[in-house]
Amino acid sequence: MHNYLDFEKPISDLEGKILELKKLASEDESVNTSDEIARLEGRVRDAMVEIYSKLSPWQKTQVARHPSRPHFLDYASRLFTEFTPLAGDRNFANDDAIQAGLARFHGTPVAVIGQEKGNDTKSRIKHNFGSPRPEGYRKATRIMEMADRFGLPLITLVDTAGAYPGVNAEERGQAEAIARSTEMCLNVKVPIVTVVIGEGGSGGAIAIATGNRVYMLEHAIYSVISPEGAASILWRDSTRAKEAASNMKITAEDLKSLGVIDGIIPEPVGGAHRDPDAVISRTETVIGDALKELSARNGDELRADRRQKYLNIGRNL
């Protein structure tokens, strides 16, 4: 059973009718519903194409947050072999919101970092809903240092609403941890390929997203603040999030036009959650092509390119 978003009601109604017909056919073999099911499935496809071809920024935000959308661990299990997670920041604790470790991508040793939101209540609590604490960013910094030391390409997958804003996180130096992670991301002399697979929220995202090549999934979002947060600041009213989203330039199309990202990875009609294997396969191709291109550059070129790309974000807006 799909978790339908509010704008997907036409799809929900049609798929509900299909389920009813399938149930009827299973209960009475004399009833032939195949033609009607085929007709309704065609209408579902048409409805999805029509709806998803003109999503508003707020609707894309909803898709990026869809509970069934594939997250970091879904990508890791399909993109990499021999993925070995590493834990702890060697200072305070381990943070499961940041998943990081060593793996092979198409046989090549790589370092991998990403945010994991979880897919049910238990795992979401374990991963703190994808909002990293300071120790998570310090773990990311440690993995970046390791990648630089051993000359391993770095792949980062971004999916967070933002860094955890709790009092304890602030007491343990959240701002400093994000800044150090961003600095390390800019300074390493290995190729970095970043993909925003869901939400890219604020400094919590950019701390692992200053790559040589940055891509977004078609319905991902990337912003300095959530639409709800922006609405709360601008109008003291979080219910105006839809209005805020429309003015924030948070979609992949907007950010590509502004030069913030390098490319957009198409999603299956209906969003990544409708066909995770397809979108992960497309992501694999994009990462592979980017690493192949970047492998021809030396470390100094990679670092200079990445730093200039980061500085250009504010200049080009």
Curated annotation (Swiss-Prot):
Keywords: ATP-binding, Cytoplasm, Fatty acid biosynthesis, Fatty acid metabolism, Lipid biosynthesis, Lipid metabolism, Nucleotide-binding, Transferase. The gene is accA. Its EC number is 2.1.3.15. One of its GO terms (biological process) is malonyl-CoA biosynthetic process. Gene3D superfamilies: 2-enoyl-CoA Hydratase, Chain A, domain 1. It comes from the Bacteria. Acetyl-CoA carboxylase is a heterohexamer composed of biotin carboxyl carrier protein (AccB), biotin carboxylase (AccC) and two subunits each of ACCase subunit alpha (AccA) and ACCase subunit beta (AccD). One of its GO terms (molecular function) is ATP binding. NCBIfam families: accA (TIGR00513), AccA_sub (NF041504), PRK05724.1 (NF004344). Residues 40-293 form the CoA carboxyltransferase C-terminal domain. Pathway: Lipid metabolism; malonyl-CoA biosynthesis; malonyl-CoA from acetyl-CoA: step 1/1. It is an enzyme of class 2 (transferase). Belongs to the AccA family. It catalyses: N(6)-carboxybiotinyl-L-lysyl-[protein] + acetyl-CoA = N(6)-biotinyl-L-lysyl-[protein] + malonyl-CoA. GO terms for cellular component: acetyl-CoA carboxylase complex. This is Acetyl-coenzyme A carboxylase carboxyl transferase subunit alpha. The keyword Zinc-finger does not apply. InterPro entries: Acetyl_CoA_COase_a_su, ClpP/crotonase-like_dom_sf, COA_CT_C. It is found in: Cytoplasm. PROSITE patterns: COA_CT_CTER (PS50989). It comes from Rhizobium meliloti (strain 1021) (Ensifer meliloti). Component of the acetyl coenzyme A carboxylase (ACC) complex. First, biotin carboxylase catalyzes the carboxylation of biotin on its carrier protein (BCCP) and then the CO(2) group is transferred by the carboxyltransferase to acetyl-CoA to form malonyl-CoA.
